[in-house]
Amino acid sequence: GSLRVLSIIFPYTNRIREASKTAKTMPAEVYSVGRNFANEFMGDVLKKSVSFFQKKGYNAMAGMQSPVFQILTKEEPLQLYSVWSERHIAFAAGLGTFSLHEGFISEVGCNIRVPSVITDAPLEISPRKSDDPYANCLFYTTGKCKKCVERCPADALSDKGHDKLKCYLYLKTIEQEMKPRLSGLLKPHQRVVNGERNTSFPLGCAFCQFNVPCTSKIPVKERDEDNRD
């Protein structure tokens, strides 16, 4: 039978968003802990979702937990790739669109995590409201905004998009600064990079997702509603 993908959106809490509004160079500690714990939480949700479908007699698999999931890198210049994109799956599922900062802008904003499950269960299909991959982003729809560019301490964003290398290097800077401070709280996260298992302690950054028009909503939708009024 045909396959379905169940895409799930988990927004960060208002407490984390409020604490992160004023962060300038290092993320709020409550965000970094939340970002770190989110990996294990999402993994548990995915395992239980897969188990639910399998007990109903259907096949199911979480892309992130597949043995073939990995991060690939290319040298000179360094480039990063993933063999599975949760954001592209969420777009295909009709949950939102992409943005200038390459986050995913959903009905509850861009400050989210987005895991998914593949199954042959006959799930109802949710239609996309737009086939435009950037329909929810103010910059791409109006040519204005760029608040995420202003918020990025790594200078990794511009009107040309997202420089993944600058972003990655700044994440490493954050890890060096924050890991000793939060070491008693952090959980290790394992993933495969270029075929080799790698252990890290994800702490996040996400300055581009906090204190911006798309943090918790679709700003384009709000603008359109204001225009109708």
Residue ranges of model-derived segments:
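Non-catalytic, usually N-terminal nucleic-acid engagement modules in DNA/RNA processing proteins
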Residues: 1-39
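Catalytic cores of enzyme domains
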Residues: 26-229
